[in-house]
């Protein structure tokens, strides 16, 4: 239900940033209150990312107030915090559709708005892209400014520091804003600090600073004394001198919820040349007590009533993440050499309990997927048994390390790959539909696809007991609901399981689509196989099936291009087995947001769609 804009007298007249710039500066605090209230009430009705957006209301307003967007380029890293930005840039009345099928994209998206200059979703990309845009802006000489807004988590990644290092050496005009919500605003982020931030960013100070550099350049001892004096002044109010060493003019930290001071400081900084760095302190969930107290819980929320706690999910089957977390605890009880690594995805990967029960075996490396994988390599070389818990979409970021540091050395590292397949509302940047394709071509890798919770547990155990690289990939969400046997069984590598005997048509299923495929196999009197292993394939079974079946179907929740079905095709061709194979999976395109079921229906990956594809391909089955 759309919100009544009569309750938002200022916001109702703000459709685009040019409308915002018509407000008097003194009106901005009241406008921020309205924007924050609108954001809270909208997300509570629709679900979505909440706490991050609440924390950057003043910063977003100040940036659009001072910078001439969309002429100036404004980039938000990751994009969880971009809801206020979307509201201010022509999408206010569509916010009820965010993250929904055919609705607004969950993150800034270039195809959606000219104000979204970079499509995002993964972290730490903003500074590198901003530098590229600043280089182009310098060449076009039209006075275009470039701003990157990045959080304290995202800036810890190596890619962000690589970009900072490069930007400082090029000296292009650009502003990096560090949104630091790691802690609440501390005492040193008060009136004095905000005042000093305005002084340090002001024209008079800047002119004196640049002029003194020229005057003192020929007097090295005096120049060094002046530099140390400036560093001491900044050091009194900020520990972040590292950014000065990168070549940035550092300002801050300052209160990220004082919109008046932010406007004054940003106005000063917009007129400066060279790389600028503004450090603002914000509180995630600002203005909504429950979110301030538990920003992780309120990071992404379902529909809820703001004056009540979040609704509890109804009892359901265990999620695959929970299955992994339970296995990890049980395995750690047995194996003192087990270690578990996550790149900042403890909650999502089901590792909260493990991090407490086995704190000495738990390693959160922050947003550093490349490091996570090479860390595991070092552990394996030294005799430990590492498990890397990682989302499919984020494993893409560590592909070189997987090959160079793990596979080439044939190290015993287990990859527990969560969110494999269609993940839903986060859209193209988060769908985990490429891992089978990029894993199965890597020598020494064992790749497993469980069809249910028990098989997942047994595969994790099997992979952990191997002395070579292994991957178990499982989807987001709940499993089949079967009762899980705590006893772990080691599977025979490369052996599939015939689930149902049939005639002529054989359906080879990789993963949890086995449930959908079963009803189809019943209707078509087809043989159904739980393939279990993408690499190595059960070649003996394939040979036997090829001698008794004329037609094949492969089903997987992965890109058809290069996926498990392609592995079957390649094997049949290598053996000169002439048979017909239909590959069913993710088509060769990026998949939009929507619920998992909506996407399955769209791609004809539900039972009805799978049957339709098979009958359409093998027309005699109609």
From Swiss-Prot:
Annotated pathway: Metabolic intermediate biosynthesis; 1-deoxy-D-xylulose 5-phosphate biosynthesis; 1-deoxy-D-xylulose 5-phosphate from D-glyceraldehyde 3-phosphate and pyruvate: step 1/1
Keyword terms, alphabetized: Isoprene biosynthesis, Magnesium, Metal-binding, Thiamine biosynthesis, Thiamine pyrophosphate, Transferase
Reactions this protein catalyses: D-glyceraldehyde 3-phosphate + pyruvate + H(+) = 1-deoxy-D-xylulose 5-phosphate + CO2
E.C. designation(s): 2.2.1.7
One example of a Gene Ontology biological process annotation: 1-deoxy-D-xylulose 5-phosphate biosynthetic process
Binding site for Mg(2+): 152, 181
Pfam family, one: Transket_pyr
Cellular component, GO annotation: cytosol
CDD domains noted in UniProt: TPP_DXS (cd02007), TPP_PYR_DXS_TK_like (cd07033)
NCBIfam families tied to this protein: dxs, PRK05444.2-2
Assembly behavior: Homodimer.
Protein name (Swiss-Prot/TrEMBL): 1-deoxy-D-xylulose-5-phosphate synthase
Lineage per the UniProt record: Bacteria, Pseudomonadati, Pseudomonadota, Gammaproteobacteria, Alteromonadales
Gene encoding the protein: dxs
């Amino acid at each position: 239900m759309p919100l009544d804009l009569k309750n938002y007298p200022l916001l109702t007249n703000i459709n685009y940033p040019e409308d915002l710039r018509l407000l008097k500066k003194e009106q901005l605090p009241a406008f921020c209150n309205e924007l924050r209230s609108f954001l809270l009430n909208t997300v509570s009705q629709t679900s979505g990312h909440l706490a991050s957006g609440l924390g950057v209301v003043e910063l977003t307003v100040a940036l659009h107030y001072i910078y001439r967007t969309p002429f100036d380029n404004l980039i938000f890293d990751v994009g969880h915090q971009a809801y206020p930005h979307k509201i201010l840039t022509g999408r206010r009345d569509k916010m009820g559709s965010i993250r929904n099928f055919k609705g607004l994209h969950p993150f800034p998206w270039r195809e959606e708005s000219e104000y979204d200059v970079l499509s995002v979703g993964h972290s730490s990309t903003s500074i590198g892209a901003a530098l590229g845009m600043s280089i182009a802006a310098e060449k076009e000489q039209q006075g275009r400014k470039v701003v990157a807004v990045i959080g304290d988590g995202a800036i810890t990644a190596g890619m962000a520091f690589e970009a900072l290092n490069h930007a400082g050496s090029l000296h292009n005009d650009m502003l990096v804003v560090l949104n630091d919500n790691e802690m609440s605003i501390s005492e040193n982020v008060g009136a004095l600090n905000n005042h000093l931030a305005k002084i340090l960013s002001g024209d008079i100070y800047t002119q004196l600073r640049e002029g003194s550099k020229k005057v003192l350049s020929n007097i090295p001892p005096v120049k060094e004394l002046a530099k140390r004096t400036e560093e001491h002044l900044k050091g009194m109010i900020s520990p972040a001198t590292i950014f000065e060493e990168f070549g940035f003019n550092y300002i801050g930290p300052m209160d990220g919820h004082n919109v008046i001071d932010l406007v004054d400081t940003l106005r000063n900084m917009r007129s400066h040349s060279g790389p600028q760095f503004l450090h603002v302190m914000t509180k995630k969930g600002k203005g909504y007590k429950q979110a301030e107290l538990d920003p992780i819980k309120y990071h992404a929320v379902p529909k809820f009533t703001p004056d009540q706690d979040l609704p509890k999910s109804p009892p359901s089957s265990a999620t695959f993440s929970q299955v992994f977390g339970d296995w990890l605890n049980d395995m750690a009880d047995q194996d003192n050499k087990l270690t578990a690594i996550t790149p900042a995805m403890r909650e999502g990967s089901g590792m909260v309990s493990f991090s407490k029960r086995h704190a000495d075996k738990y390693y959160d490396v922050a947003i550093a997927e490349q490091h996570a994988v090479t860390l595991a390599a070092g552990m394996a070389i030294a005799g430990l048994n590492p498990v890397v818990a990682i989302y499919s979409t984020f494993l893409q970021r560590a592909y070189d390390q997987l090959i160079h540091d793990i596979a080439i050395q044939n190290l015993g590292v287990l990859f527990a790959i969560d969110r494999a397949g269609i993940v839903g509302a986060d859209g193209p940047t988060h769908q985990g539909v490429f891992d089978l394709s990029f894993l199965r071509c890597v020598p020494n890798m064992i790749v497993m696809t469980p069809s249910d919770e028990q098989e997942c547990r047994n595969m994790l155990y099997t992979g952990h007991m191997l002395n070579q690289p292994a991957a178990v990939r499982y989807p987001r969400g709940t499993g089949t609901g079967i009762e899980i046997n705590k006893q772990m069984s080691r599977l025979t590598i490369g052996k599939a399981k015939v689930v149902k005997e049939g005639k002529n048509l054989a359906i080879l299923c990789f993963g949890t689509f086995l449930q959908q495929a079963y009803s189809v196999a019943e209707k078509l009197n087809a043989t159904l196989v739980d393939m279990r292993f993408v690499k190595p394939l059960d070649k003996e079974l394939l040979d036997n099936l090829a001698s008794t079946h004329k037609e094949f179907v492969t089903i997987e929740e992965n890109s058809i291009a290069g996926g498990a079905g392609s592995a079957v095709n390649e094997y049949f061709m290598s053996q000169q087995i002439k048979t017909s194979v239909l590959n069913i999976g993710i088509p060769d395109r990026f998949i939009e947001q929507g619920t998992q079921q909506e996407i399955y229906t769209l791609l004809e990956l539900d039972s009805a769609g799978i049957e339709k594809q098979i009958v359409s391909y093998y027309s005699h089955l109609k």
